Protein backbone atom coordinates (compact mmCIF):
# COMPACT_ATOMS: atom_id res chain seq x y z
CA UNK A 1 0.00 0.00 0.00
CA UNK A 2 2.70 2.52 0.98
CA UNK A 3 4.69 1.92 -2.20
CA UNK A 4 1.58 2.52 -4.32
CA UNK A 5 0.85 5.75 -2.45
CA UNK A 6 4.44 6.91 -2.89
CA UNK A 7 4.26 6.09 -6.59
CA UNK A 8 1.43 8.59 -6.95
CA UNK A 9 3.24 11.25 -4.92
CA UNK A 10 6.05 11.02 -7.48
CA UNK A 11 3.52 11.87 -10.22
CA UNK A 12 2.74 15.31 -8.78
CA UNK A 13 4.66 17.77 -11.00
CA UNK A 14 6.79 20.67 -9.80
CA UNK A 15 4.66 23.70 -9.01
CA UNK A 16 1.57 21.61 -8.19
CA UNK A 17 0.11 20.09 -5.03
CA UNK A 18 -2.35 17.33 -4.18
CA UNK A 19 -4.18 16.55 -0.97
CA UNK A 20 -3.59 13.42 1.07
CA UNK A 21 -7.08 12.27 0.07
CA UNK A 22 -6.41 12.81 -3.63
CA UNK A 23 -3.22 10.76 -3.45
CA UNK A 24 -5.02 7.95 -1.63
CA UNK A 25 -7.93 7.95 -4.09
CA UNK A 26 -5.61 7.98 -7.11
CA UNK A 27 -3.67 5.04 -5.65
CA UNK A 28 -6.89 3.06 -5.21
CA UNK A 29 -7.43 3.63 -1.48
CA UNK A 30 -10.44 5.99 -1.26
CA UNK A 31 -10.39 6.09 2.54
CA UNK A 32 -6.61 6.06 2.87
CA UNK A 33 -5.70 9.71 3.47
CA UNK A 34 -4.16 8.91 6.86
CA UNK A 35 -2.16 6.09 5.32
CA UNK A 36 -0.99 8.51 2.64
CA UNK A 37 0.30 10.83 5.36
CA UNK A 38 2.00 7.97 7.18
CA UNK A 39 3.62 6.72 3.96
CA UNK A 40 5.37 10.07 3.62
CA UNK A 41 6.74 9.98 7.17
CA UNK A 42 8.62 6.78 6.42
CA UNK A 43 9.62 7.57 2.83
CA UNK A 44 12.87 8.32 1.06
CA UNK A 45 13.78 12.00 1.67
CA UNK A 46 14.06 12.47 -2.11
CA UNK A 47 10.32 11.82 -2.52
CA UNK A 48 8.54 15.15 -3.20
CA UNK A 49 6.62 14.94 0.10
CA UNK A 50 6.22 18.71 0.21
CA UNK A 51 3.70 18.58 -2.66
CA UNK A 52 1.11 16.78 -0.52
CA UNK A 53 -1.10 18.98 1.67
CA UNK A 54 -4.28 18.89 3.71
CA UNK A 55 -7.68 19.82 2.30
CA UNK A 56 -9.73 22.74 3.61
CA UNK A 57 -12.40 22.62 0.89
CA UNK A 58 -12.59 22.03 -2.87
CA UNK A 59 -10.77 25.28 -3.61
CA UNK A 60 -8.24 25.52 -0.80
CA UNK A 61 -5.65 23.32 0.84
CA UNK A 62 -3.26 23.90 3.72
CA UNK A 63 0.07 22.89 5.13
CA UNK A 64 -0.63 20.62 8.08
CA UNK A 65 2.94 20.25 9.32
CA UNK A 66 3.97 22.40 12.25
CA UNK A 67 7.21 24.12 13.17
CA UNK A 68 10.35 23.69 11.09
CA UNK A 69 8.80 20.98 8.91
CA UNK A 70 5.91 23.27 7.92
CA UNK A 71 8.33 26.10 7.17
CA UNK A 72 10.44 23.77 5.04
CA UNK A 73 7.36 22.57 3.15
CA UNK A 74 6.27 26.16 2.42
CA UNK A 75 9.79 27.10 1.28
CA UNK A 76 10.04 24.10 -1.04
CA UNK A 77 6.64 24.86 -2.57
CA UNK A 78 7.45 28.55 -3.01
CA UNK A 79 10.74 27.60 -4.69
CA UNK A 80 8.64 25.70 -7.24
CA UNK A 81 6.38 28.70 -7.84
CA UNK A 82 3.46 27.73 -5.59
CA UNK A 83 2.00 30.72 -3.74
CA UNK A 84 1.58 29.93 -0.04
CA UNK A 85 -0.66 32.41 1.78
CA UNK A 86 0.17 31.79 5.43
CA UNK A 87 -0.47 28.05 5.44
CA UNK A 88 -3.10 28.06 2.65
CA UNK A 89 -2.73 27.13 -1.01
CA UNK A 90 -5.17 27.73 -3.87
CA UNK A 91 -6.11 24.27 -5.19
CA UNK A 92 -7.83 25.74 -8.25
CA UNK A 93 -4.56 27.30 -9.38
CA UNK A 94 -1.97 24.87 -8.00
CA UNK A 95 -3.87 21.62 -7.53
CA UNK A 96 -2.79 18.59 -9.53
CA UNK A 97 -5.46 16.37 -11.08
CA UNK A 98 -4.42 12.74 -11.37
CA UNK A 99 -5.37 10.77 -14.45
CA UNK A 100 -8.23 8.41 -13.75
CA UNK A 101 -7.21 4.86 -12.86
CA UNK A 102 -8.10 2.24 -15.45
CA UNK A 103 -11.02 0.06 -14.40
Feature map (PLM): residue ranges:
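Nucleic acid-binding interface residues in structured DNA/RNA-binding domains
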Residues: 1-103
